[in-house]
Swiss-Prot record:
Family, per entry: Belongs to the cytochrome P450 family.
The name this protein goes by in its record: Conidiogenone synthase PchP450
Annotated organism of origin: Penicillium rubens (strain ATCC 28089 / DSM 1075 / NRRL 1951 / Wisconsin 54-1255) (Penicillium chrysogenum)
Assigned EC number: 1.-.-.-
Gene3D superfamilies assigned: Cytochrome P450
Gene Ontology BP terms: conidiogenone biosynthetic process
Subcellular compartments: Membrane
Membrane topology: Single-pass membrane protein
Amino acid sequence: MLLLWFGFFSFVCGLVIYRLQFHPLSKFPGPKLAALTSLYEFYYNVVLGGRYLWEIERMHEQYGPIVRITPHELHVADPNFYTEIYAGPTRRRDKDPRLVRLAGQPTSMFATVDHGLHSSRRAILNNYFSKRSIAGLEDMIQGKVQKLVKRLNIACDQGTVVQLDAASSALTADIISEYAHGVSLDYLDDVNFNNEVADSILSLASVVHVLKFFPFLLDLSKFIPDKVLENLWSHAANILRLQKLVRAQADVALQNGGKVNGQATMFGALCDPSLPAQERTLDRLQDEGFSLIGGGTETTTGTLKVIMFHLLNEKALLRKLRKELEESPSGTWAELEKLPYMRGVMNEGLRLSGVITRLPRRAPDEALRYKQWTIPPNSLMSTSSHFVHTNSDLFPDPLVFDPERWIRAEAAGQRLEHMIVTFSKGSRQCMGNHLALAELYLVISTLVREFDMDLYGVTADNIVTHREYGFGVPKERGGGLRVSISRVRTP
């Protein structure tokens, strides 16, 4: 026993000496405890609950723009270095395998570690999500928006309170499922907008940091019978049911040349016979199909939630946007993008929402230079959109929702829109950015034109980011964006 304790003590001492003196990142600034052990991150993200991002912010205030935040990871809080970390397709950037496995869809594009394999998988779907292709979807998107309008008109007649973020989640889920899978989920038909699915995604996100440190829990959950899992954790069971539905649709597509109900789908591209056999399996189609629903609903809804809260919380902003919309001859996506104040509202919403977690990358083929520092090849490095979007040099009073900052920047010749990184940048930029923007422009303009709304028991604590669970989570999570609603009175 004494020998075992001596061996353990020797191992710990050796590890401490290596990480502080001989590790490739040992010369970079940062807290010694963070360099020694990931328990530093564990404390802030697991014990305190999603608070490490703000501890990293404090580190940068103390140590400067580049900091060693874990034994194996550097964090850079310089907006000008963002495109070095998240570089274009000609420069290889691999993901961290320990992080992407948390997605639970191991063969999806999002979970693909290798740069080359990701590029080939992305190329298959690029055309489906190009701006031109999404513009061709406008009639379908408008149809779903009008379906939402009908539901909201019923709420006006009945005097019921609407949970606007649940309605948005239903809308975006119906759009992406019909476009990608050929069959709409029809969440807009559900009396509660199928709110349990959105709630389940948020509930699972709340344990993402636990799973990062104990990834075997994710593997174990796959062996728990559905009935048992439903009793233990209904949110996980809801996600499993949706996965099974996507799998069934993918199976139909595989058996019918990529078509579902006779309609061409994204699955058709994924099971093209020219692809290698391992790239057109049922598991692969399920993973990609489910990943699109997960990625295409809650992030878009989060932006809508931020925008509508600020418009309703400060009605002068709402009145200014409504006036601009009333003076616009058209409500098409292309025309809405040209409206200066509307564009400012959208940019502020994107700036104050979205995925804010660190997205680590490795540059296996090159050493990167940042000021006097050389980042060794294959080192984990990251930043967060939070540090770009709240940079006071770029965005004075960064926590203030100020649509006119974009109008002022344009008048001054500043290309401030290039600093919006909500969808990330580079070769792994979110593929669904054009779809998300089309949805947001069309639904927000419709809501502002047609309805008067008032916040119902909602404060900034229900909206403003306080914790990081992948995306930003507010201090008070219950209830969502609840509003009382009535039709706009025409003069």
